Amino acid sequence: MWRAALLLAVSAVAPPTDPPSDPPLSDFALTPAPVGHERRFLDEVAAQLPDRLATERDALGSLIVRCGPPGAGDEPVRQLIAVGVDEPGYVVSQIREDGYLRVRALGAPTPPGDFHLLREGRPARVWTRDGACAGVLLVDSVHLRSPRPDVLGEEYMYLDVGADSPRGVAALGIALLDPVVQREVVGLLGGPVSAPAAARRAAALVMLRALRDVPEVADSAGLVFAFVAQSTVGTGPLGRGGEAVLRRLRPGEMLVLRGAAGLEEPVRGSSKLVESQGSHWRPVELRVAYADTPVEQVEPDDVEALFRALLQEVVYGEARADEAESAAVPPAEPEPQR
């Protein structure tokens, strides 16, 4: 009985099927994007882009948006603005005879030591072919379990979806390798938003807003935006997903939007370029609290500061570069008077 009541309470918080045209961050954070399963979220992003912008997907699923007038897609990529959209999670690795599910972590080969601990006893969702199914990541009964391990690994994790047999699991539409995610999103009116991967969602929303609402951005030839899938797996600033995008585009410069803990200022930029895959990149970082946890938190004013910083880089930075180039050309010598 308690399982059914808890699952009913969890299922009441369902992500909207039709996101608004200008979603607040708390709505934008509702759709998960676990590693290798980013398509549902990226489809939402693509649906909100202006029709005149050229979009494409690469082999790993990243969404690439080319700015500029029609026919400008063949121009060399002057600047790439990128954000990783994927997040850690689980997949269903086993369906037990008693209806419980075993899970395996997605993302980094060795998750942080508290990764599973922070998800223990929390509501979760299995994203099936037909939609989301509510569940709970189990906590062992205190009076029945053996001594608690020093590090809680995935071998101790079970997912309860309210079924008591494999047939009951199948009736819910759940299959092996379906992704399992947490989606507890809390947004206070005019205050901070707390959600898994909140900083990544904020950066993606800032990029979407710039593409949709600022003509100088959408009309800028040689400028490309990338919403990168599989960025938390592999090396480099955006993992193997970022490496694939760099090989495809060969930009002159890549700007990576990401969250960072411990910042005193809302946004921190860097003028130092780092080489990667034959291109150069630098970060623009958003202040975030409780980074890399299921309750990652960002402030709306900080997100607005990130939007202004992006415009400063993309729009006004280009203007300053043109002015600097003009100033570097010495003035012509006046002709002698006759």
Residue ranges and their predicted role:
Residues L6-R338:
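N-terminal hydrophobic/helix-forming segments and targeting peptides
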